[in-house]
């Protein structure tokens, strides 16, 4: 139910097929463009929302995302907000082995509003999103510095946790580090309640 490249399934809340790396980034730009056009056409009392996305190192390394990012700035899509999970890891290893791009400088040169935060601090995330929402003249990139596989004792900050299972023993130690005492696939009732509420809002 959680493929690496999600495909259209409105019952699961998946509105679009995003395809390979970078395509989801470009699709988000298209969604933000649609919001801008429809809001201007029918008025912001009818159409008025933000477009959010979480993007990866791999997404931003693709040429497709660069072209879309330039257009987003050119079109002034100020209600587009992306959080960049900046963990410096790709499926092949450290990103700095294959890329020299400073994403902050690149996006600023395009005309995006760029913020840098600690990706593990929820208060910084909330503050950055609110700052981005307050600036509707530019698309926003929030660079959230993070550690992939955090709390995994042997695979933290490695490509070994990128798209691969931790393994039984590693998962056991990972859960111990999180002080997780419930069964692996058991989650608090509050989690189910929250998602059930959100799913009820989806119109199929």
Region roles according to the model:
Residues 47-49, 76-77, 135-138:
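Short, well-ordered loop/turn elements at secondary-structure boundaries
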Residues 54-55, 59-63, 81-83, 87-202:
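Conserved acidic/glycine
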Residues 10-12, 22, 38, 42-44, ...:
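General N-terminal targeting signals
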Residues 73-81:
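Boundary/activation segment at the start of structured domains
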Residues 1-74:
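Cofactor-binding active-site loop characterized by glycine-rich and histidine/acidic residues
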């Amino acid at each position: 139910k959680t493929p690496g490249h999600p495909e259209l399934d409105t019952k699961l809340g998946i509105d679009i097929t995003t395809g390979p790396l970078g395509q989801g980034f470009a699709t988000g730009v298209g969604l933000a463009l649609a919001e801008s056009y429809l809001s201007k056409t029918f008025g912001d009392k009818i159409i008025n929302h933000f477009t959010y996305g979480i993007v990866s190192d791999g997404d931003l390394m693709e040429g497709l995302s660069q072209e879309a990012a330039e257009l987003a700035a050119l079109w002034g899509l100020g209600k587009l907000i992306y959080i960049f999970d900046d963990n410096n890891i790709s499926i092949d290893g450290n990103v700095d082995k294959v890329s020299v791009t400073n994403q902050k400088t690149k996006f600023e040169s395009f005309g995006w509003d760029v913020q840098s935060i600690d990706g593990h601090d929820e208060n910084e995330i909330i503050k950055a999103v609110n700052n981005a929402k307050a600036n509707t003249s530019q698309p926003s990139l929030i660079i959230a510095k993070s550690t992939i596989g955090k709390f995994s004792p042997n695979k933290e900050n490695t490509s070994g946790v990128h798209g691969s299972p931790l393994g039984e023993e590693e998962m056991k130690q990972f859960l111990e580090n999180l002080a997780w005492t419930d069964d692996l696939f058991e989650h608090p009732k509050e989690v189910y309640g929250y998602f059930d509420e959100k799913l009820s809002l989806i119109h199929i």
